[in-house]
């Protein structure tokens, strides 16, 4: 997840150095990056970093943001930006690919009997061992 704040005067939602150079290239992250809820809209309304939601959508995608929490910018404004040649199909496809790949790996497109995660009972998920792991991760 990106963040609401800025790093080195660049909002994290569209910070290519952070999302692509550090996260993907240096650290080898292969997953997808989702914004904080409403984060791309804040590029216009709060950060005043860009003037339009189309610019927010385009620059976020180019920087390595794959999914918006909410649908204020990656819905109509992204499509509008694409029609105005502000972004490329390849950039949008890369973001969509990363999101869909993760969902496929989680079995979200499989039927219930093929998805191993549907067989994990709440008793296992909430077990003392798992609670201990979660507590240690939070520390």
Predicted feature locations:
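Glycoside hydrolase catalytic-domain context in secreted enzymes
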Residues: 1-139
């Amino acid at each position: 997840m990106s963040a609401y704040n800025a790093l080195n005067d660049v909002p994290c939602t569209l910070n290519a150095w952070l999302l692509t150079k550090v996260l993907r290239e240096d650290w080898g992250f292969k997953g997808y990056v989702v914004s904080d809820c409403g984060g791309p809209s804040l590029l216009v309304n709060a950060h005043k970093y860009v003037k339009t939601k189309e610019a927010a959508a385009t620059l976020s995608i180019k920087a390595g943001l794959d999914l918006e929490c909410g649908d204020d910018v990656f819905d109509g404004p992204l499509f509008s930006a694409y029609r105005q040649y502000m972004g490329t199909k390849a950039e949008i496809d890369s973001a969509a690919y990363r999101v869909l790949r993760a969902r496929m790996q989680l079995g979200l497109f499989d039927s219930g009997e093929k998805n191993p995660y549907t067989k994990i009972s709440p008793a296992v998920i909430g077990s003392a061992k798992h609670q201990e792991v979660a507590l240690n991760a939070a520390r």
